[in-house]
Amino acid sequence: MAQIFNPNPGNTLDTVANALKEQANAANKDVNDAIKALQGTDNADNPALLAELQHKINKWSVIYNINSTVTRALRDLMQGILQKI
């Protein structure tokens, strides 16, 4: 007989959440490091450091939006399943 439920599938909600959390934490650290690099008196108007900060903030924003979208999609999925029960 075919196995209906496999308790150890490749992707679970926990693995997705952990992967997103790791990426968000790394992006947050990158933004904080870029801000610290700008805090010197000579670095405040350095175009290269400002561009790097902007890039890090954009990357953080994209990861945050992906995290929000995935979380919302999973919530909607669970609501749909529960409504049909």
Curated annotation (Swiss-Prot):
Membrane-crossing residue ranges in chain numbering: none
Location in or out of the cell: Secreted; Cell surface
Signal peptide: none
Coiled coil region boundaries: 13-41
Protein transport recorded as keyword: yes
GO cellular component, one term: type III protein secretion system complex
Keywords: Coiled coil, Protein transport, Secreted, Transport, Virulence
Xref: Gene3D superfamilies: 1.20.58.90
Domain of life: Bacteria
Annotated GO biological process: protein secretion by the type III secretion system
Keyword match Transport: yes
InterPro entries noted in UniProt: T3SS_needle-like, T3SS_needle-like_sf, T3SS_needle_YscF
Subunit organization: The core secretion machinery of the T3SS is composed of approximately 20 different proteins, including cytoplasmic components, a base, an export apparatus and a needle. This subunit polymerizes and forms the helical needle filament. Forms a stable heterotrimeric complex with PscE and PscG in the cytoplasm, blocking it in a monomeric state and preventing its polymerization.
Domain notes from UniProt: The N-terminal part (1-11) is species-specific and essential for export/assembly and the function of needle.
Family from the record: Belongs to the SctF family.
Chain's role: Component of the type III secretion system (T3SS), also called injectisome, which is used to inject bacterial effector proteins into eukaryotic host cells, facilitating the establishment and dissemination of infection. PscF/SctF forms the external needle filament that protrudes from the bacterial surface.
Protein name (database record): Type 3 secretion system needle filament protein
Taxonomic source organism: Pseudomonas aeruginosa (strain ATCC 15692 / DSM 22644 / CIP 104116 / JCM 14847 / LMG 12228 / 1C / PRS 101 / PAO1)
